[in-house]
Amino acid sequence: NSDFIALGEKLLDVTFAKGYTKVEKEHQDMLLDLATKIRENMSVRRVCVVEVPANAVSATYVHSDFKTGVIAVVKGSTDDQVKQFAYDCCLHMAAFTPAYLTQKEVPQSYIDEQTEIFKGQMANDEKMASKPENVKQGILKGKISKHLAEICFVDQMFVKDDKMTVTAKMAEVGKAVGAKL
């Protein structure tokens, strides 16, 4: 609906022009006007402003279903290759929906929970029964490491090159443009 798209643009314009960092009455009023006109229930749940530092680029991606949108900021260079990498990171996040940026951000309680799940799976696996305890511990550690790599953005295999992680791709792009990203 063109009215809905126009409202989205107007909401963005007002948010940036007035420096809003949370949903304001003005947002609600604008929504109510259109909701009344098109008879749809709409709301803005939150407003987030992403500031891009001087030596950085940003990219956005909105999936074709208009339900998934991603913003990425890459610091260190404004080179076109970095802009493309930022866009590719957006595609990656939309496709793989990482839960965390890095493994440092994963709560210990989550790791403990997953450890218990893997221990339970291993206890029910007949092949594991005959293995020595140190081998079981190594397998458990490997399962946890693999799982963390799957849920952490920087450790995931890159969407456009599944032979390297996001971190490795970032290093490759950084080297190509002569910058630490």
Question: Where would I find each of the regions flagged by the language model?
Answer:
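N-terminal assembly/interaction segments in proteins that build large macromolecular machines
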Residues: 1-181
